[in-house]
Regions:
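GST-like domain detector, emphasizing the conserved glutathione-binding G-site
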Residues: 1-90, 103
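Residue-level "edge-of-site" marker
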Residues: 1-2, 137, 160-161
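A short hydrophobic/aromatic micro-motif that marks alpha-helical segments and, especially, helix-coil
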Residues: 46-47, 129, 165-166
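GST-like fold's C-terminal all-alpha helical module
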Residues: 56-149
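Extracellular ligand-binding/catalytic regions of CAZymes and related secreted enzymes
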Residues: 157
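Acidic/histidine-enriched, glycine/proline-rich intrinsically disordered or flexible terminal extensions
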Residues: 160-176
């Protein structure tokens, strides 16, 4: 569980949030997008870095995530969930327009922007699925459905035992 944080993780990254990647030289990377870019610079079989739209990813990591957290956890943030849901939907409207051009956010095939943003949209949709499904964003809904139905998503969401120091690493095969 996220509340059961290994001491080694907290020592490596005092902000104590997942993910944390400790490199062989001791350097620590503790932001999801930075870990993704680090990994893709080493192996990018689908050329995802070609779809690294930093501005779009940052907008969702910052503005959309802000509204998502307050919509999903209004008590924790002392927030009005409907106002934040509305603001999140406005950003999904921008995404809807973008998806009118391509099947994915930057091109026809998935890229880094899709993989970085999809978890936020998935969480937003899950708060009230019936409401989300009734919204006028059919391209976003289809985009999300395709990503969630992909074998890559199944492998990424595989449940594994909580990490502990000196445990064997869990390795994954190719993307699909």
């Amino acid at each position: 569980m996220l509340r059961d944080k290994p001491a080694a993780m907290v020592a490596a990254s005092p902000k104590a949030t997942v993910p944390v990647l400790v490199l062989e030289d001791g350097a620590v990377i503790d932001e999801s997008i930075d870990i993704m870019r680090w990994a893709l610079r080493r192996n990018d079989p689908e050329d995802w870095l070609a779809g690294d739209d930093t501005e779009l990813i940052d907008r969702f990591d910052d503005r959309f995530k802000h509204h998502l957290d307050r919509y999903k956890y209004p008590d924790r943030h002392q927030a009005e969930p409907v106002a934040h849901r509305t603001a999140g939907l406005a950003l999904l409207g921008e995404m809807e327009q973008r998806l009118a051009t391509h099947t994915n956010l930057c091109r026809e095939t998935r890229a880094l922007a899709d993989i970085a943003i999809m978890p936020f949209v998935r969480q937003f949709a899950a708060v009230d699925r019936a409401w989300f499904d009734a919204q006028p964003v059919p391209r976003v809904q289809g985009w999300l459905a395709r990503h969630v139905a992909s074998p890559l998503f199944d492998r990424a969401m595989l449940r594994v035992a909580c990490w502990a120091p000196r445990t064997a690493p869990i390795m994954s095969s190719s993307a699909e």
